[in-house]
């Protein structure tokens, strides 16, 4: 009986953790951001989650992230340099993605 309960609890934990990681990059980011960034792992630039964690206590996170995407730079990360507007993101894509990134760690 204990092994059945343990199996149920373990399975429930795996299902719940799977939901937490099941965030896909929005279409606005796949073509222009996905070359250098992923949701949960560093590629050439930091993961979207790492950026979100960096700004999670900042009420102006989305606007700061948008400014960083717009002007480009390294932003204190130890790797990579982001070109201005990434691979050509327009203003509406930048605003959408900035809010998406800022909200990941909330």
Language model: regions and residue ranges:
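Axial heme c-ligation environment in periplasmic c-type cytochrome domains
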Residues: 35, 44-55, 68-96, 104
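Sequence/structural segment immediately N-terminal to covalent heme-attachment motifs in c-type
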Residues: 22-40
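Bacterial N-terminal signal peptides that target proteins for export
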Residues: 1-9
């Amino acid at each position: 009986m204990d092994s059945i309960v343990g199996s149920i609890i373990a399975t429930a934990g795996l299902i719940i953790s799977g939901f937490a990681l099941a965030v896909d990059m929005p279409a606005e980011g796949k073509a222009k951001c996905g070359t250098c960034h992923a949701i949960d792992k560093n590629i050439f630039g930091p993961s979207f989650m790492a950026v979100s964690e960096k700004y999670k206590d900042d009420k102006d996170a989305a606007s700061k992230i948008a400014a960083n995407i717009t002007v480009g730079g390294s932003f204190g990360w130890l790797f990579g340099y982001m070109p201005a507007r990434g691979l050509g993101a327009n203003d509406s894509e930048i605003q959408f993605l900035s809010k998406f990134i800022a909200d990941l760690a909330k």
